[in-house]
Design a protein with these regions (language model features):
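Histidine-rich, glycine-flanked metal-binding segment
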Residues: 1-5, 12-58
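Alpha-helical scaffold segments that flank or form the walls of functional sites
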Residues: 56-57, 74-137, 158-172
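Histidine-centered catalytic micro-motifs
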Residues: 59-71, 205-214
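Active-site gating loops and adjacent loop-to-helix segments of metal-dependent hydrolytic enzymes
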Residues: 72-104, 138, 142-148, 213-261, ...
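Active-site glycine- and acidic-residue-rich loops that bind
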Residues: 123, 180-196, 204, 210, ...
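Glycine-enriched alpha-helix->loop->beta-strand junction motifs that scaffold or abut catalytic
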Residues: 137-141, 196-203, 257-260, 277-286, ...
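His/Asp/Glu-enriched, well-ordered alpha-helical/loop segment
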Residues: 229, 254-258, 287, 298-384
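C-terminal cap of metal-dependent C-N hydrolases
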Residues: 356, 372-422
Length: 422
């Protein structure tokens, strides 16, 4: 059996653990066979040793929420006047793009992600072409086919199109598909129920944007405010539409969405009842720290969510509201700006929590025997003090040296490492 051994000065098998001068053994077909202190093995033609030197090997970083379709839309330096103004601008820009434009921007975003250490991402696809665009990209993708329809009469039409997209075979071994009703202000109750039933029947995840803004809370509670004006301006608010009169989480709970292992994106504004409801289900929350800051939201309740035991993963959102698609940049932002979060919590959110959210928690997110060998390798400065390694990493020491997916080097800044097909 052919075996590859990856060695480095530091290995983080999972958050809260650190090994020094360690080796990760990978056997065909790309699973971890063991971790151990490094000792030179006897010569063996079936063993290839990849020495990353002064580096950290950690579980592959997981971007649990992104929109690669918006990679062409760099966020403005100036904060938008309102969320709906920003949303309207995104809609206008997207209407100008051709299919080729969208495909190119998706590929560009995937390659930026891979080069920053991401091995698995949750991609929202509103165009329906993400799976085809990403078929040659060497990272894992869970692609959420997005649906939008606030008019009840359009729910059937939206579901027919969604089923058609989901029935297409996955184009590569690293792709799988799921469903994403966009948000409570853009999806009718009928469509939410139908997508939840579809996700249940297909044994897959459902992702939805939720409790993202105060204006969303107002719209669902009373039907007034910024979102009403926005939807009326688009001609998207059905005649006689009535608000549910509930907080976003309670609303989706009533519709049965929380009965699934749902992925609740953002959750910037949650009351205690909402958090208790999330805790009582097998749902995950995805926190997008720098996008959250871009819109000037109040502090995210991530500390409370973690204390309650809710699974919180990290996402970058899109370049329309962020500076990069790097999960490592999100981690470092949190280290600088959320002093209430510990290093191991930040690492956990970027690895195993993301894997759990996307449904890969039993095979990804840790460096453990039997798990897929998805790893991020970060080059560390020579002469680094041999203490508080995780803190130094999050302070900014280290840059992405390689991204390894299923035991194969998918990207590296050291091209010589690609020789031999490791």
């Amino acid at each position: 059996m052919i075996r590859t051994v990856h060695i480095a000065k530091y290995v983080i098998p999972e958050a809260g653990m650190l090994l020094r001068n360690a080796a990760v053994h990978v056997s065909d077909p790309g699973r971890i066979s063991r971790l151990e202190p490094w000792q030179s093995p006897p010569p063996n033609l079936e063993t290839k040793v990849v020495d990353w030197g002064c580096a950290i090997i950690l579980p592959g970083l997981v971007n649990a929420h992104t929109h690669l379709e918006l990679t062409h839309l760099p966020g403005q330096e100036k904060r938008p006047a309102s969320f709906t103004q920003w949303l309207a601008e995104v809609i206008r820009e997207k209407q100008r793009w051709s299919r080729a434009d969208i495909q190119e921007t998706i590929i560009r975003g995937a390659r930026q992600s891979l080069a920053s250490g991401t091995t698995l991402l949750g991609e929202i696809s509103s165009s329906g072409i993400s799976r085809e665009a990403l078929k040659h990209e060497k990272l894992r993708k869970l692609i959420f086919e997005e649906v939008i329809a606030l008019t009840p009469e359009k729910a059937g039409e939206a579901m027919a199109a969604l089923n058609q997209r989901l029935d297409r075979p996955d184009p590569d071994a690293f792709s799988s598909s799921s469903v994403s009703p966009h948000a409570p202000y853009s999806v009718s109750p009928e469509l939410y129920r139908a997508t939840a039933e579809l996700a249940r029947a297909r044994h897959t995840r459902l992702a939805t944007h939720l409790a993202e803004t105060k204006q969303e809370l107002e719209f669902l509670a009373s039907g007034t405010g910024e979102f009403r004006s926005f939807l009326c301006g688009l001609g998207a608010l059905p005649p006689g539409w009535m608000p549910p009169g509930l907080a976003p989480v309670a609303y989706l709970d009533k519709l049965g969405v929380l009965d699934l292992p749902a992925i609740l994106i953002h959750c910037n504004y949650l009351d205690e009842d909402s958090m208790v409801r999330i805790l009582s289900r097998s749902c995950s929350v995805v926190y997008c720290p720098r996008s959250h800051a871009y819109f000037g939201h109040e502090p995210h309740p991530v500390r409370r969510l973690l204390d309650m035991g809710i699974n919180v993963a990290l996402g970058t959102d899109s370049l329309a509201s962020n500076e990069s698609l790097s999960v490592l940049d999100e981690m470092r932002y949190l280290f600088r700006n959320r002093k209430d979060l510990k290093c191991d919590e930040i690492i956990r959110m970027a690895t195993i929590n993301g894997a759990v959210a996307l449904g890969f928690g039993n095979v990804l997110g840790r460096l453990r025997r039997g798990y897929w060998a998805d790893m991020t390798v970060l080059r560390m400065p020579e002469g680094l003090a041999d203490r508080n390694i995780e803190a130094q990493l999050l302070e900014g020491a280290g840059e992405c040296l390689a991204t390894i997916v299923q035991g194969r080097i998918a990207w590296t800044s050291a091209p010589g490492m690609l020789t031999g097909g490791a």
